[in-house]
Regions:
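N-terminal acidic leader/helix
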Residues: 2-47
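Short alpha-helical "patches" and their helix-cap loops
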Residues: 7, 60-64, 84
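N-terminal non-cleavable signal-anchor helices
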Residues: 20-21, 66, 77, 81
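Short, charge-rich amphipathic interface segments used for partner binding and complex assembly
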Residues: 40-75
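Short intrinsically disordered terminal tails
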Residues: 1-4, 80-84
């Protein structure tokens, strides 16, 4: 029986945390509004979730991944701003 993948925050968050941690240079680039940073991170997020799901993501799933990845980046930005 195939494993069902559910794109919920509980499932996505550990995956996306790994994307943030593994691509800190691009996260800094995103914070600096460097061209291409968001696209790179969005692509890495979709790729990581697709690998975990074991299949291509549906359009709505990709949009959920992008939205949650953006949320993660906003959390990083807010923490950096609060520290300064």
């Amino acid at each position: 029986m195939p494993i069902v993948f559910s794109a919920t925050n509980e499932v996505l968050d550990p995956i996306l945390a790994g994307v943030v941690k593994g691509n800190q240079d691009k996260v800094v680039g995103w914070l600096r509004e460097e061209s291409g940073s968001w696209g790179f991170l969005a692509g890495q997020a979709v790729s990581a979730v697709r690998k975990e799901a074991g299949r291509d993501l549906e359009d709505m799933e990709r949009r959920l991944v992008w939205s949650r990845m953006w949320w993660w980046l906003e959390q990083v930005r807010d923490r950096v701003q609060a520290a300064n």
